[in-house]
Amino acid sequence: MSKKKILITWPLPEAAMARARESYDVIAHGDDPKITIDEMIETAKSVDALLITLNEKCRKEVIDRIPENIKCISTYSIGFDHIDLDACKARGIKVGNAPHGVTVATAEIAMLLLLGSARRAGEGEKMIRTRSWPGWEPLELVGEKLDNKTLGIYGFGSIGQALAKRAQGFDMDIDYFDTHRASSSDEASYQATFHDSLDSLLSVSQFFSLNAPSTPETRYFFNKATIKSLPQGAIVVNTARGDLVDNELVVAALEAGRLAYAGFDVFAGEPNINEGYYDLPNTFLFPHIGSAATQAREDMAHQANDLIDALFGGADMSYALA
């Protein structure tokens, strides 16, 4: 029996690539240059499944162009806002993501952003690299400690809970809001206080972490009203999705001192981010590295393979996103 064919749009960790090649005829696109949507659709004519990344924006107009032989789209990411699930359902295309491998890695980056923002690490690092450090001074780069401060977590799924676990080690008070309340045992484990509204959570959050998925309901929720509800001088971090944030208003709040600091790993329109962030000293910015740990990326790649294996192996597909 001939092997099924799959297109992998970016190079994956070698172990995952080797696994895919054992089971399928693999067409693997390199990362230089990046694959275009037109190239992906053209190649899709000769394969049975696509293994994509968040760089390939599969909106409805793209899904409508994908040939009928495509049975599955598996994405090498926890997020799936780059795929129009309704369009895939209408076409009978199964969709899966990699939800588990990134949890700890992303929570670690969120914790790093909290620490780096609170202690003004980016400013200090820049001072060293630009050879502008004048030497120790009593009031230079004075930041905030984390202990006994309230961390508000918006989105208490696996990453939000993993962040709570790490913040406990810094003696932070954990508060959260989610549309689905955690179990009483989880709340006890993380010593987490549930708020029944976002406004209630915001009002006590000296530190505020965005850990919600990008949906029509959450998109650009972090806006003027949200910022106004936070305590004066709050610190906000985002490891979720860039389009949760209204960047113009965040930049203005940072310039005015309404927000003390922002630590962001994700941005709307990345890699082209809002110009206002570049010159602000009170930002601690990373280039979307939340899952960039060796084991996490390997786990993600294997999970992306799992969905394709399940489809072609006739396994239960009830867990698929579409």
From Swiss-Prot:
Known EC number: 1.1.1.29
GO CC field: cytosol
Name of the protein this chain belongs to: Glycerate dehydrogenase
Pathway terms, separated by semicolons: One-carbon metabolism; formaldehyde assimilation via serine pathway
Source organism per UniProt: Hyphomicrobium methylovorum
Description of pH dependence: Optimum pH is 6.8.
The protein's role, per its UniProt record: Active on hydroxypyruvate and glyoxylate.
Stated family: Belongs to the D-isomer specific 2-hydroxyacid dehydrogenase family.
Induction: By methanol.
Subunit structure as annotated in this protein's UniProt entry: Homodimer.
Keywords on record: NAD, Oxidoreductase
Notes on temperature effects: Optimum temperature is 45 degrees Celsius.
Reactions accelerated catalytically: (R)-glycerate + NAD(+) = 3-hydroxypyruvate + NADH + H(+)
Top-rank taxon: Bacteria
Pfam families according to UniProt: 2-Hacid_dh, 2-Hacid_dh_C
Gene Ontology MF term list: glyoxylate reductase (NADPH) activity; hydroxypyruvate reductase (NADH) activity; NAD binding
Binding site for NAD(+): S158, I159, D178, T239, A240, R241, D265, H288, I289, G290, S291
Active-site annotation: R241, E270, H288 (proton donor)
